[in-house]
UniProtKB/Swiss-Prot annotation:
Subunit of the 40S ribosomal complex. Part of the small subunit (SSU) processome, composed of more than 70 proteins and the RNA chaperone small nucleolar RNA (snoRNA) U3. Gene3D superfamilies: 3.30.1330.30. GO terms for molecular function: structural constituent of ribosome. SUPFAM superfamilies: L30e-like. It is found in: Nucleus, Nucleolus. Pfam families: Ribosomal_L7Ae. Its main location: nucleus. Subunit of the 40S ribosomal complex. Part of the small subunit (SSU) processome, first precursor of the small eukaryotic ribosomal subunit. During the assembly of the SSU processome in the nucleolus, many ribosome biogenesis factors, an RNA chaperone and ribosomal proteins associate with the nascent pre-rRNA and work in concert to generate RNA folding, modifications, rearrangements and cleavage as well as targeted degradation of pre-ribosomal RNA by the RNA exosome. This is Small ribosomal subunit protein eS12. Belongs to the eukaryotic ribosomal protein eS12 family. Keywords: Nucleus, Ribonucleoprotein, Ribosomal protein. It comes from Drosophila melanogaster.
Amino acid sequence: MADVDVDVPSAAPVLDGAMDINTALQEVLKKSLIADGLVHGIHQACKALDKRQAVLCILAESFDEPNYKKLVTALCNEHQIPLIRVDSHKKLGEWSGLCKIDKEGKPRKVCGCSVVVIKDFGEETPALDVVKDHLRQNS
């Protein structure tokens, strides 16, 4: 029984070290949703960006309104807010909690989301460190 307790903590850092940006971003979005620091949708996101309340902005590339993309990008550039782009608005909606979870834990009825703004990261996690490292490398 003591061996099991020793193995579990040693396995956790290996998973965190191999964490890619998408997995880390998904965990950071969950933690900020729990901390009530997440804003969904173009209107609310633009208000948070303009008031400089945002810490991080995530924009979906599959969103088909180019003027909104330009607006969000311009607001992020103007206020020096980091911007991460993801490929699918359905994936972004799933990550930010805009879906139903069935009995098996799989997402159903996923609602797409064009942009998500994080106002509060919540608690510090290794996933947050991965996201911050990614932002430092790409800036």
